[in-house]
Amino acid sequence: MSTFDPDALECLAAIVEEGGFERAAQRLSITQSAVSQRLRALESQVGTVLIVRSRPLKPTSAGQLLLKHTKMLRLLRADLERDLKELAPSSLGGAREEERISIAINADSIATWALPALSELARQGLPMEIIHDDQNFTHEWLREGHVLGCVTTLKQALRGCKVEPLGAMQYIAVATPDFAQNRLALPCGTGDRPTAPALTQHNFRDVPFVAFNRKDELPSEFVGKAFGLKRVTLNQLFVPSSQDMVRAVLAGWGVSVVPRLMADALIEQGLLVNAAPAYTLPIQLYWHCWNLESEVLDALSAALRQTAAAVLVAGPVSGPTQLIPENPQVRQVLTR
């Protein structure tokens, strides 16, 4: 097989990653016509179409293979630059913008512990691109060759990849004190003892839940396991940001199921209350990456592993995820 032109491969990657020819041209600092010419030359060399001209643009199966090959070349270059900098620190410039090392991480991890984990690598100049998605879907980015690693809930290693457990992220249901008092307080009948406002199997259907997006299954999973229900239908509002979900709850939008790492300080300040204090939902997270010998991959894996060990609940969850009693001694996210 003939050697592929690295510039043509990066052109293919830019088209897919930027979602179009015009933005790819801007990223590569070439004309849109040059982008088309490079793609046509690469397709002629391979002998098949590499891009489906749809909205959004999608790579064909052959295109996905070449994308994965391109990312492997980026990884090799990053390894080489890392080694050369140790021998001659002033001999290399920064990595080219189009040669970013891409990983997929779930939004809640980005909002809590993942960025501190990667800060030192960023300061060292590793050109990273972090793609966020729901924790149940980040592995699809790895499966399709768009990233070289991902944080996900998938336990089984993907083909050609290795996997290691990171620990469990603990989730609780939260609301503002006013919302809880107005919407979650139980009416007391004759002889009933008053109870603190809480989410129950009787009132959850009438309460709005703030979720990340339509793929977010955490609220339904939490309610279903908390109350032993197989099917759960919730009244949901969608806010596609972990931090902004908390802001929406603070604004009185409703209840949300969020990481304790985000909620504990707000509960201590009296801004939020635990809407279901008897329950915590642990979600086990795993780090998947290509099964390659690479200093960059090793550095990424070590950085995520070390920080996760400090802030997540240690040890893999065996079998189906179970609701566990709330632990008041939650460890805080490391600050660096």
Report residues per predicted region.
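Short helix-boundary/capping micro-motifs
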Residues: 13-31
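A short LG(V/I)-centered, amphipathic sequence patch enriched
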Residues: 43-62
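Alpha-helical linker/hinge and terminal dimerization helices associated
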Residues: 45-46, 66-94
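Hydrophobic hinge/microswitch elements
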Residues: 229-274
